[in-house]
A protein has these predicted regions:
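An amphipathic, aromatic/His-enriched active-site/gating alpha helix that lines ligand/cofactor pockets
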Residues: 27, 31-36, 61-93
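Short S/T/G/P-rich N-terminal loop/turn motif that feeds into the first structured element of a domain
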Residues: 1-54, 65-69, 96
Length: 96
């Protein structure tokens, strides 16, 4: 299963801050590689800077049964705790 998180930053987040956040978020999500059932993680920035676009895609390749383990993981808790303040909105989408 692919677990996708589309991220839209708050309007006051400039390009320099987006670059800093990208580096930090990649580091946070790199910790998922230690979890059995997670096969890969990609943190992909959008290449078109328009107000009607999302800024970031986080795509996690995992076994469907691993989703509760991911939800309880330290990287997921760090993501929700430390980065929610930068987000205008996010969308979650899962597919096989």
């Amino acid at each position: 299963m692919k677990h996708c998180i589309l991220v839209k930053y708050n309007a006051d987040i400039d390009a320099a801050k987006k670059e800093k956040l990208l580096s930090e978020i990649k580091e946070v999500f790199s910790g998922l590689s230690a979890i059995e059932g997670i096969h890969g993680v990609e943190v992909i920035p959008n290449v078109v800077d328009r107000s009607n676009r999302y800024d970031l895609l986080i795509r996690i390749d995992m076994e469907k049964e691993t989703l509760p383990v991911y939800d309880d993981s330290e990287p997921h808790h760090i993501w929700k705790r430390d980065y929610a303040c930068y987000l205008e909105k996010k969308a979650i989408f899962d597919y096989d």
